[in-house]
């Protein structure tokens, strides 16, 4: 649909605050582990998905601070862990942490990933891509 027709007799006015997208925010939060520099994201929704992502990146050594309600600062000066075992069953984001940890630490340990129950979503293509880049998967 290219347009909306609104009828009502009165002009619309006011402001609408749009929340950030949890899926995009979680992936950007994970990507912050790639650099030692501070990364600041705004309009980040604070809900379960971003809280689990926060737990994943702080578990591996990143520092994270909520500066404001929807502004988060992250810095991964020293990534000290290559394991996200207990968190991997909470959602599927841990599979996206694989290349980040391989880059920063050189190895990674992640058991079977969890997440929602919307149907089968295999991770084999992630693993095959890592193998093509030289990773060994056991």
Identify the meaning behind each predicted range.
Residues 1-138:
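Structural preference for solvent-exposed beta-strand-turn elements
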